């Protein structure tokens, strides 16, 4: 088999700058003659604010909606719902990890959406990362925060880690 991907998590120092996760990948399986017998794409980006600023959330989601809509207007609602349902701490009374984003997996190329389509889609979503996230960082990076803000950030960051361990 063969796999490639890009994955990142940014855990900021400033309590008012959200954590962000981004992951895009492709997998291939081969038979004994080295022929591709299966291939699929997956990925997504999601935002986990410690303190919610609705304008930042709207901006983040709109940026990914715009990226998705260029390929298929059904992608954003579908992939947003998958993300919303995936990043949940079920052992904590269904606590959400953050405000969601998009997430997709097992997208196999076919006659209408081939390999190049899915590569271009993943690239467009990756390219949306900077315009979706950096404006929020720029707006929030100079905000002063208290020890109480930092304590809350550490609790929420612990829940983020918990999600990945459970």
Where are these regions (language model features)?
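A domain-level signal for the structural core that forms small-molecule/cofactor-binding pockets
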Residues: 1-166
């Amino acid at each position: 088999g063969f796999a490639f991907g890009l994955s990142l998590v940014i855990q900021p120092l400033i309590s008012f700058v959200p954590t962000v996760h981004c992951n895009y990948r492709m997998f291939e399986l081969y038979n004994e003659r080295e022929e591709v017998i299966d291939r699929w794409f997956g990925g997504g980006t999601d935002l986990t604010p410690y303190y919610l600023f609705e304008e930042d959330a709207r901006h983040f989601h709109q940026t990914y909606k715009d990226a998705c809509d260029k390929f298929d207007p059904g992608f954003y609602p579908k992939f947003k719902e998958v993300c919303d349902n995936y990043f949940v701490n079920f052992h904590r009374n269904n606590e959400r990890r953050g405000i969601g984003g998009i997430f997709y997996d097992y997208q196999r190329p076919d006659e209408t959406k081939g390999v190049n389509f899915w590569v271009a889609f993943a690239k467009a979503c990756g390219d949306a990362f900077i315009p979706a996230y950096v404006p929020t960082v720029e707006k929030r990076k100079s905000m002063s925060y208290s020890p109480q803000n930092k304590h809350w950030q550490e609790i929420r960051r612990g829940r983020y880690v918990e999600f990945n361990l459970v």
